[in-house]
Amino acid sequence: MKNTPNRYLIIALLIGVVFHGFGIFFTLEGTYDALIHLFFADHYASHWFEPWNYSWYTGFTVMGYPPLVHQAIAILSLIGGLKFGMFTVAIIGVILFITGVYRFALLITASAHAAGYAAILAVFSSSFVETLHIFGQLPSIIGVSILMHALPEIYLWLTSGKKKYFLTSLSLLAVTVCSHHVTPIFGMVFFIFPLIGMAVMDEARTRVNTMKEITFPVFLKAFFRLLKRMIAFGISALFLIIVCILPYWINTKNNPITQVPIPHGSRDNFLEITSSGLVFFLIPWGILLLLMPYFFYRYYSKRYLFFGLSLTMLTILGTGGTTPIPKIILGDNAFNILTLDRFTLWGSIMVLPLFGEFAYRFAEGDYKTFLSTKLGGLYHRILAGILAGLFLGTTVFTMTLNNFRPSQPDPINMLPIVNFLNQDQHYKWRFLPLGFGDQIAWLSAQTDAMTVDGNYHSARRLPELTSRAIERLENSKFRGVEGIGSLQQFLTVPEKYNLKYVFSND
């Protein structure tokens, strides 16, 4: 029996690598963000120590994004090219996510069986499938996965005080910071702070006979006993967050985002724009919505109280503009800059340990015994089949969503365009792609030619772009007179931007 939990994890890893490793060859290049990260990787592969990239927006600094994932793709590209590096990092992300969920679940539930179930369920998590196969957010996946690996180390440092856990927790946190800037900042609030609260609860529990005997004075005494360790970790973590991506903070200070907010579906009112509600709320939560009462009931028990508060906050923030609450909490500036689907992603990840616990109890534990006794084994199996069908059905639907509702134009043959730009010194002039979608990043990665447009909107500095609520110039047609006016500024005076060629796929 001792090997069973490890067998669950091994099964999860094998299924995850095969399922996602096979799937990404059909989905990853058609996602929103994957090719953008490939473009950044191309920059590091060509000019590792150059902080500026001149391919987009008449020049921008790559210091506006933590470099680890991009640099990893760049290094791997030396073996098999940029796409090889991108696919390899994606598979590494899958492995890190599954093992991260296992360790996080083991920390929360203290049950290797439940953690094993959580790891298997993580493979088919609709929020993870969407993040990887629809959004292509590789840094987010790597960042949150490493953060989950860091949580047990942080807990062990707080409860045991052993220096090796202090060093491992900070090392993993440093990797998280270098992977994705938003994850450690909000991870401190939504994951690490609740973890500290749970550690204090466990410390208080050692001084009493039962959890019911933990009162506020008992909790407060335990808090002060761990205070030195918390302060040591907090100061060190803050130091790492600042130092590890210091160029990012300097760039943020010198070049704050002042552009007109670009609309994003995660900020919509999901009751009015149901398509946004489907993509940014129903799909990532999936079948987990049916089990929300169980998750809140468990997380609002005394030991997990702070995780319950965190889950509540994440759930509310993930509703976007459906209610005014997220905007009140975040403030106008953060609300208009952040994409709020990240909160739903983190919320769905936070409940995975309890989802694994529920699945274990339902498949092998007390829930199975109760249902089999009350209703009979047949009804238990039917109910299990329905739940499994809904869960896997949501996964398959999410995986194939782009087939029903394409988010990108059909794949474009870049070779003729690349050949044209690379011959007769055409690359000395700027070009403007229209109707390319996110494939603009793949085109830019294959040529030295520059474009007035781009696909990393936070880096834009041209007033002609920052004064309009459009992502790329090709989207100007959707913004009426305002959008067309932005495009006209480039087409009527192209010499101002050294613009000579327009490639239209629209």
Place the predicted regions along the sequence by residue.
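Luminal/periplasmic acceptor-recognition loop/helix of membrane-associated glycosyltransferases
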Residues: 451-500
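Residue-level recognition of alpha-helix initiation/capping sites
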Residues: 96, 412, 434-435, 485
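Short periplasmic/luminal acceptor-recognition loop of GT-C membrane glycosyltransferases, typified by
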Residues: 422-465, 501-505
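Membrane-embedded transmembrane-helix bundle of lipid-linked glycan/lipid transferases
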Residues: 1-421, 442-447, 456, 493, ...
